[in-house]
């Protein structure tokens, strides 16, 4: 019966990612599934961002395991406001800058985990 169904879901793990398009621009987003999201952005399945339409090939340049959606959204907002140079510095250094997230818990940057984009290509 419907009353016996467990409606409690496990909290999702959220990722922050940066994708490079054919113009060398970086797009920032969040997802619970990097594999699904890159497929959406590439037009292989529905749901990709309009900002990336027609700008392929698209490649992950950085992926960070963040945690919950609220934290991931805060990271996304901050990273999207960075200059091109600072975004590329994140890609190159494979770390989120601590000073960018002063108002967030100090542990967040320390505990965010860089994941090789190759795992999801």
Language model: regions and residue ranges:
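Short arginine-rich
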Residues: 77-92
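GIY-YIG nuclease catalytic motif and its immediate N-terminal context
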Residues: 1-47, 53-66, 70-77, 95-121
């Amino acid at each position: 019966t419907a009353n016996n169904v467990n409606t409690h879901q496990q909290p999702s793990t959220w990722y922050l990612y940066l994708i490079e398009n054919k113009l060398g621009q970086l797009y920032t987003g969040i997802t619970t599934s990097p594999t699904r999201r890159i497929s959406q952005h590439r037009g292989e399945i529905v749901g990709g961002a309009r900002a990336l339409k027609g700008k392929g090939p698209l490649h992950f340049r950085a992926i960070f395991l963040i945690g919950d959606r609220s934290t991931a959204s805060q990271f996304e907002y901050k990273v999207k406001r960075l200059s091109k140079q600072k975004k590329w510095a994140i890609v190159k250094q494979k770390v989120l800058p601590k000073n960018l997230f002063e108002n967030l818990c100090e542990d967040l940057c320390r505990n965010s985990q860089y994941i090789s984009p190759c795992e999801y290509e």
